[in-house]
Curated annotation (Swiss-Prot):
It is found in: Plastid, Chloroplast. GO terms for molecular function: structural constituent of ribosome. This is Small ribosomal subunit protein uS2c. Belongs to the universal ribosomal protein uS2 family. It comes from Zea mays. Keywords: Chloroplast, Plastid, Ribonucleoprotein, Ribosomal protein. Its main location: plastid. It comes from the Eukaryota.
Length: 236
C-alpha cells in the first residue's frame, strides 16, 4: 500500500472537536493507547494517533478505489443521515443511513431478493402501472415502495457484497461490524474513547458524537475514494 499525503492537520481536527472523548467513567481500557489526557472529567484523544490511522485508512480506500473496489458507508445516527447520504453519493459509494437490518450482509440472498422487489416496484411506478390498479392496491404498493426506498435506497445499485465497509459509530453499528467480521469484509471504523479498537481492521480514534468531527473524518475518506476512482477511470 503506497503512502500518500492527505492534508490531515492537527489544527483542523482540534477545530472540529475530533479530540473530545467520553467521560472518564465510560471509557474502554483498550482505548488507553489512543488517549493523551484527561480534562474536566473527559478523556482527550491523541490526535497524532488519529492522524496516523486516518492517513492509513485514506491510503487503503484510495488503493481499493483505484482497483475498482466497492464501498459501503454505514451511519444510522439520525443527525448524520443527510451527511452520510451526500458523502456516499458524492463518492459513488453504497450507504445505509436509516436502519441496519440484522442479516443485511450475512443473509445476502434475502437482501438481494428485497432489492430486486424494490427495483421492480420502482420500474412499475415509473411506467405508470400503479395508475391502472385499484386505489387500495396502488396505495399498498406505494407504501411498500416508500419503505424500501427509506431503508434500502442507499444500496439499490449494490449487486454483490461490498469490498470495504466504513462505519461511523462502532457501538450503534455493532451488528454491521459483526457481519463484516463473519464474512471477512475489511472494515474502517471511527472509535470514541468508549469503543473497542480491535473490532475493525482500521480503527480511527475520534469523536463519533459531534457532526463536525464525523464530517471531517468522512470527508477525508470519501475524497481519497474519489481520487482513487478517478485514477481507475483514467487507467481503464
Amino acid at each position: 500500500m503506497t503512502r500518500r499525503y492527505w492534508n490531515i492537520n492537527l489544527k483542523e481536527m482540534i477545530e472540529a472537536g475530533v479530540h473530545f472523548g467520553h467521560g472518564i467513567k465510560k471509557w474502554n481500557p483498550k482505548m488507553a493507547p489512543y488517549i493523551s489526557a484527561k480534562r474536566k472529567g473527559t478523556h482527550i484523544t491523541n490526535l497524532a494517533r488519529t492522524a496516523r490511522f486516518l492517513s492509513e485508512a485514506c491510503d487503503l480506500v484510495f488503493d481499493a478505489a483505484s482497483q475498482g473496489k466497492s464501498f459501503l458507508i454505514v451511519g444510522t445516527k439520525k443527525r448524520a443521515a443527510d451527511l452520510v447520504a451526500s458523502a456516499a453519493i458524492r463518492s459513488r459509494c453504497h450507504y445505509v443511513n436509516k436502519k441496519w437490518f440484522s442479516g443485511m450482509l450475512t443473509n445476502w440472498s434475502i437482501t438481494k431478493t428485497r432489492l430486486s422487489q424494490f427495483r421492480d416496484l420502482r420500474a412499475e411506478e415509473k411506467m405508470g402501472k400503479f395508475h391502472h390498479l385499484p386505489k387500495r392496491d396502488a396505495a399498498i404498493l406505494k407504501r411498500k415502495l416508500s419503505t424500501l426506498q427509506r431503508y434500502l435506497g442507499g444500496i439499490k445499485y449494490m449487486t454483490r457484497l461490498p469490498d470495504i465497509v466504513i462505519v461511523l459509530d462502532q457501538q450503534k453499528e455493532y451488528i454491521a461490524l459483526q457481519e463484516c467480521a463473519i464474512l471477512g469484509i475489511p472494515t474502517i471504523s471511527l472509535v470514541d474513547t468508549n469503543c473497542d479498537p480491535d473490532l475493525a481492521n482500521i480503527s480511527i480514534p475520534a469523536n463519533d458524537d459531534t457532526m463536525t468531527s464525523i464530517r471531517l473524518i468522512l470527508n477525508k475518506l470519501v475524497f481519497a475514494i474519489s481520487e482513487g476512482r478517478s485514477l481507475y477511470i483514467r487507467n481503464r
